[in-house]
Amino acid sequence: MSGLSSPWDVVLGHPFDREPCRSTLAAAEAAALLETVYPPREDWFAALRLTPPERVRVVILGQDPYHQEGQAMGLAFSVRRGVTLPPSLRNIYKELESDLGRPAPDAGDLTPWAEQGVLLLNTVLTVAAGRANSHKNLGWQTLTRQVIAAAARLPQPVAFVLWGAPAQRAYFEAIGNRQQATTERLPLEGKAPPKGADAVASEGPHAPRLVLTAPHPSPLSAYRGFFGSRPFSRINEFLAANGEAPIRWTL
């Protein structure tokens, strides 16, 4: 059994019944027999389990799971309660506080976001303990690009949040090419986004899309345009404009 949630398994056409996803899963399971792999096996597909297709309203793409003990829980950027906030998540919270004018959360568990329809998807679903991006060649990207493409075809409004070049590349590869979506570069720190400049890409008359790009929230790049990008309020404005309830970003 793959552990992939039934709704996504159906939408994706049972990907683990065929190659290459079958081999990817087998390779990850073999690695987990030889060394510690994060997150735990039961959480490899946590993002898809907590956010089924019919509930997706936002997709936030990450790269691969945290590789230190006790951190990874199957949701991009999220850590378990009681775990020290990683630097990128700390910067996400700083931007949330600046954007919404509310105190930053203390805990790093983003499960409440996932349960509201925020798909927190890493493009690589496993990692070896202590070795960042060590499973990048297992082939998880085939599955996660299928998920991204499926999310882009959903009938409801969906916002895509692409922080950093790897996330942006994953999105555009998944949908085919850049001409299939209009993408706005978010402003540099200290500059407000142009009024009415939100990027909306329509995949059909009933499926408006918002695609937001910005530098990664890592301390190495957050000051190059992530801070000041206001993704949380802009997502909620997009959802409201399309008749959807806002995301409760405070935890």
Task: State where each predicted segment sits.
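A polyanion-binding, active-site-adjacent surface
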Residues: 2-169, 174-175, 204-213, 217-238, ...
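Short, basic, low-complexity termini and linkers enriched in Ser/Thr/Gly/Pro
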Residues: 179-182, 187, 207
